A protein has these predicted regions:
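Flexible, solvent-exposed loop/hinge segments and secondary-structure transition points
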Residues: 1-113
Length: 113
């Protein structure tokens, strides 16, 4: 899932036979990154330290926040936020690695937290 800086969906891709929940999880990872301005790995760390805060924000986002690795902010070479990528389908660490690789392949900067 690719979101713009407002968290509007720009693109979503999935393979045949994949649960539609994967897209929702990927969206939640990217949405969380946009909402709080940090990659979802940093959000996972914050959730461990401030569970009530993350739970409250998740409520404000109507449950569309998944604070585990795989939601990565996209920045241009000047540091301007372009959006976020969210990936789900493997381990969270591998999801994050795939997002970072895709962003780098586009010549942009990835921010995982």
């Amino acid at each position: 899932v690719v979101l713009d800086p407002r968290a509007a969906t720009v693109a979503m891709l999935s393979e045949d036979g994949v649960s539609q929940m994967r897209g929702k999880i990927a969206h939640g990872k990217a949405n969380a990154a946009i909402a709080l301005g940090m990659g979802s790995r940093a959000l996972m760390n914050r959730a461990e330290q401030q569970a009530y805060f993350i739970q409250s924000v998740n409520g404000l986002l109507d449950g569309d926040m998944v604070p585990v690795p795989g939601g990565v902010l996209i920045r241009d070479n000047d540091g301007t936020l372009l959006g976020a990528v969210g990936i789900s389908g493997d381990t969270s660490d591998n999801d994050e690695a795939a997002a970072v690789a895709g962003i780098a392949a586009a010549g942009l900067s990835a921010e995982t937290g």
